[in-house]
Amino acid sequence: MWELVALLLLTLAYLFWPKRRCPGAKYPKSLLSLPLVGSLPFLPRHGHMHNNFFKLQKKYGPIYSVRMGTKTTVIVGHHQLAKEVLIKKGKDFSGRPQMATLDIASNNRKGIAFADSGAHWQLHRRLAMATFALFKDGDQKLEKIICQEISTLCDMLATHNGQSIDISFPVFVAVTNVISLICFNTSYKNGDPELNIIQNYNEGIIDNLSKDSLVDLVPWLKIFPNKTLEKLKSHVKIRNDLLNKILENYKEKFRSDSITNMLDTLMQAKMNSDNGNAGPDQDSELLSDNHILTTIGDIFGAGVETTTSVVKWTLAFLLHNPQVKKKLYEEIDQNVGFSRTPTISDRNRLLLLEATIREVLRLRPVAPMLIPHKANVDSSIGEFAVDKGTQVIINLWALHHNEKEWHQPDQFMPERFLNPAGTQLISPSVSYLPFGAGPRSCIGEILARQELFLIMAWLLQRFDLEVPDDGQLPSLEGIPKVVFLIDSFKVKIKVRQAWREAQAEGST
């Protein structure tokens, strides 16, 4: 009996023990590892994973490996090595590892964000980027769409004058409408029940993608009941049902001679492919309804929660740093005033505001460890070999908090992005990649940067944003999910007297 148990354990150890493809090659230093569970028993059990990985660099260096369950994962925590992975060898490392939770969220690896590299991912990324190009000029200009929604946001916030509120949902609505206009040329009215549906499934997907689920680390555990997977499936189904309803309704009014949004772009590509008018890389099987709705779902998921979260982080840091907030008010008053609303061209004048946004993206990156990459081929990072199929994590937190690259990296110091005179934006370090880089970089970076600047500029022009009367400041600890979230908090909204007076003068 005991002999059989021992034999079984030895067999399992052999099957799941990491095997090197190139026995003579030099591999990154590794944490201790055990069969089946890998390095999990030796990883810190408390604190944020990105910070724990950063601390491990002191012992193992800027690149090291861990066994996450049965999978080898290389952790990269230096900008030079990170750029090698993302840019110099971007094709080598453009894959996505297969995980149970990501497979569910991406409808079995469709879409853009979680899809593995290949013809499907390249096609949908190219089509999505082509859509953003539609919004450069004219009536559909991105800035016009953003400002239209921010104006509605500000009008709504003004109804809470003198009150302390959680601005999460109002900002969510504004950002959702920007994405909806880009995807469908439609927006939601306040009170539309679909807004609550979108917010609920977004939160549900983000929450259950980020449970550090053992089934992602040890795939064979999928055979057992799993509450996290069931919850995730439920939220993904709600998302899919809503997007499918939108898609079916849109098919009736689609016009191939009027391409004005992302759904138009995807449907036109499908029509061309079905009619044999597309190139060899545009297979109609890659443009099924399921593929299309997953890509639209990715744009919503990536574009809404991320921007909403960064706006909240920015407000939180300003509440903690009233001296910076005071300078921002002075900058806006001097360079924009109250006779007009801020525009994108004001980025050249509102330098402290732009520096503040950059500092928030450094201190609290949207995704502290990005989305995991996968080696598509046997390759290398620096002097170390990396086998095909290896998962690679870029620890953006480490890049943005390296004391050798950043003076007092844990301190909120927007002025670090300005020259000493405060008259020019600078790049104080090359260890800064808030939107990633290379083939897997964020396709919505331009949109996100415009939204963040305009939302904050409009809010600061119109409102005094203050700590609530109870003195409760936001927590800056954060909640590391797929997106680095901030705990709910309230801010006291007061319409600025100077803005009120300017509006009164303009109406007479």
UniProtKB/Swiss-Prot annotation:
Transmembrane segments: none annotated. Pfam families: p450 (PF00067). Gene3D superfamilies: Cytochrome P450. It is found in: Endoplasmic reticulum membrane; Microsome membrane. Its cofactor is heme. Substrate binds at residue 202. Keywords: Endoplasmic reticulum, Heme, Iron, Lipid metabolism, Lyase, Membrane, Metal-binding, Microsome, Monooxygenase, Oxidoreductase, Steroidogenesis. Pathway: Steroid hormone biosynthesis; Steroid biosynthesis; glucocorticoid biosynthesis. Its EC number is 1.14.14.19, 1.14.14.32. Heme binds at residue 442. InterPro entries: Cyt_P450 (IPR001128), Cyt_P450_CS (IPR017972), Cyt_P450_E_grp-I (IPR002401), Cyt_P450_sf (IPR036396). A cytochrome P450 monooxygenase involved in corticoid and androgen biosynthesis. Catalyzes 17-alpha hydroxylation of C21 steroids, which is common for both pathways. A second oxidative step, required only for androgen synthesis, involves an acyl-carbon cleavage. The 17-alpha hydroxy intermediates, as part of adrenal glucocorticoids biosynthesis pathway, are precursors of cortisol. This is Steroid 17-alpha-hydroxylase/17,20 lyase. It comes from Pan troglodytes.
